[in-house]
């Protein structure tokens, strides 16, 4: 078996607010196994709805392949505040255990309870201050990582790269703070 573990994948449950993915959880997991991965994390876009289905399927897999790991996570949208016309940075959280999953549920509930419409789309951001509070409350039970090019780190790297391409580093100091 391969030692590669996919820690960022989406299922059809990511479509709760936008059309993003057509993968059924079972099919995604089966494909990961067929590819020889050692595990996969389900990290839908601010949605934990697939987790019950995934857990049920994971239990059936344990009998045939106890070494294959399925992790439950969430791709949240990080912001400093809840104002319109801002960037909603993608950020991955993965539960290490049941306590970590409780933290995911708590953060998701806060985000959905404070959702609002911005640019004709329902937004469900997690404030950085809320993330910090929950991470401290459930210290050691979550894995956190940048998500994709839509994450804050990816965005900053791209912006810095653009400054380098046009040989104009006057704005680059913003990225080194």
Placement of each model-derived feature along the sequence:
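Phosphodiester-processing cores and adjacent nucleic acid-binding clamps
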Residues: 1-177
